[in-house]
């Protein structure tokens, strides 16, 4: 284990000449709100960004099309990301992790998504699965389930969505019945990213049998090990985009979970599940920006090479204006996720900004992918060119971790509350 740890650090230093695990300081967490405004990254942030960019462009991009075609889970790339310190960045230092802030994680997410959002989603899904344990787990739970992920490249999953309960989280039917020192869990989950690869799950289940019980008291959050008897993992789903990520349904049949695996206590699950999103939505928005930036870059490169009507595409005002609009949207979306990340790292409630970032970045990722296909013309509709994959990959950003419509409900609620104050 120690040898592996040292070898991982050596690989990272060889790329960026920086030892994350020994020299990390919580810059974002130490910054006082209002202490000064700056767009300058710290040297550490620049190093993380450079490492992620190098990995994405030299190792992910050359393999992305093949993984998209086969749907194979990108195990070698995930192991490599883990070796480079680009996975599990939220894990606290007390558990052997880097303890990075959300802003730092966003910088990494954007760069990885530029290479392939399928690969990036497989990596980032770990953060979503870990976050309930990070924000609500006790020391024993954190060291047991987060600590092991710093020792080897293990995966976990956020197990909440059900076949008839997506956006309506309060409508989930999976039940947890307490019997002695255990809970017996029965139910079905759906669209679980990393579902077939996870070592353990964060599971949300109804523990109060009263159907009228409020969501804030009716649900409990559990840590469930994937090899527990009664856990039945479904087939890998064939999705429109992000095909190399692992998405499955999971059935829980008389699954026994010890009370020690309850997060905080009975009835606290809904708040934990929702609270995780304030920290995970900014990196999802950042990933959408990474895809949008890739679409802009591919379209710009093509417009500088392709000739029509006797001149380059870029020399046609209609194309140049379209590229200008695309560039504007990328920059605005990037600022939105950075604001959301800065807010939560500064200790502020960032629900409003996180939803704005998630909604806007998801929308512009779809718009820019479509615009890139349009600039490529017929070539853009063909798998020999990269932009058709971007268009397929982009759609999920308007769906997972809260749909575009749910984000607007949250934004409206938060906005009205602010106005009334």
UniProtKB/Swiss-Prot annotation:
Annotated FAD binding sites: 158-167, 191-193, 306-308, 316-317, 374-378, 402-405
Phosphothreonine modifications at: 351
Record: active site: 401
Alphabetical UniProt keywords: Acetylation, FAD, Fatty acid metabolism, Flavoprotein, Lipid metabolism, Mitochondrion, Oxidoreductase, Phosphoprotein, Transit peptide
GO process annotations (BP): fatty acid beta-oxidation; fatty acid beta-oxidation using acyl-CoA dehydrogenase; medium-chain fatty acid catabolic process
Residues bearing PTM N6-succinyllysine: 69, 179, 212, 217, 259, 271
Family, similarity comment: Belongs to the acyl-CoA dehydrogenase family.
Subunit structure as annotated in this protein's UniProt entry: Homotetramer. Interacts with the heterodimeric electron transfer flavoprotein ETF.
Protein's UniProt name: Medium-chain specific acyl-CoA dehydrogenase, mitochondrial
């Amino acid at each position: 284990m120690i040898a592996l740890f040292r070898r991982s650090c050596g690989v990272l230093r060889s790329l960026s000449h920086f030892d994350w695990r020994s020299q990390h300081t919580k810059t974002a967490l130490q910054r006082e709100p209002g202490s000064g405004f700056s767009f300058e990254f710290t040297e550490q942030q620049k190093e993380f960004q450079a490492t992620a960019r190098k990995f994405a462009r030299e190792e992910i991009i050359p393999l992305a099309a093949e993984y998209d075609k086969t749907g194979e889970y990108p195990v070698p790339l995930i192991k490599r990301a883990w070796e480079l310190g680009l996975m599990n960045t939220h894990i606290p230092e007390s558990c052997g992790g880097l303890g990075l802030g959300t802003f730092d994680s966003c910088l990494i997410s954007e760069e990885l998504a530029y290479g392939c959002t399928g690969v990036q989603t497989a990596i980032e899904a770990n953060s979503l699965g870990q976050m309930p344990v990070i924000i609500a787990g006790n020391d024993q739970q954190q060291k047991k389930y987060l600590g092991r992920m710093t020792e080897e490249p293990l995966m976990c999953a956020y197990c909440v969505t059900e076949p008839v309960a997506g956006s309506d989280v309060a409508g989930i039917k999976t039940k947890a019945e307490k019997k002695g020192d255990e809970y017996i869990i029965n139910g079905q989950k759906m669209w679980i990213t990393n579902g077939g690869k996870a070592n353990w799950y964060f599971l949300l289940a109804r523990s109060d049998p009263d159907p009228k019980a409020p969501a804030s008291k009716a649900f409990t959050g559990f840590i469930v090990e994937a090899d527990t008897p009664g856990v039945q993992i479904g087939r890998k789903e064939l999705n429109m985009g992000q095909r190399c990520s692992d998405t499955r349904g999971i059935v829980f049949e008389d699954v026994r979970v010890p009370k020690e695996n309850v997060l905080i206590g009975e009835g606290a699950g809904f708040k934990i599940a929702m609270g995780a999103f304030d920290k995970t939505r900014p990196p999802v928005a950042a990933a959408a920006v990474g895809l949008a930036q890739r679409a802009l870059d591919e379209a710009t490169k093509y417009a500088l090479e392709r000739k029509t009507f006797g001149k380059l595409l870029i020399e046609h005002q209609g194309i140049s204006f379209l590229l200008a609009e695309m560039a504007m949207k990328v920059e605005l979306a990037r600022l939105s996720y950075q604001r959301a990340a800065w807010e939560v790292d500064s200790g502020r409630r960032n629900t409003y900004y996180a939803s704005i970032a998630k909604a806007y970045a998801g929308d512009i990722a779809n718009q820019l992918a479509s615009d890139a296909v349009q600039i490529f013309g017929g070539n853009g509709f063909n798998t020999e060119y990269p932009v058709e994959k971007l268009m397929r990959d982009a759609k999920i950003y308007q769906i997972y971790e809260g749909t575009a419509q749910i984000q607007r409900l949250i934004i409206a609620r938060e906005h009205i509350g602010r106005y009334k104050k």
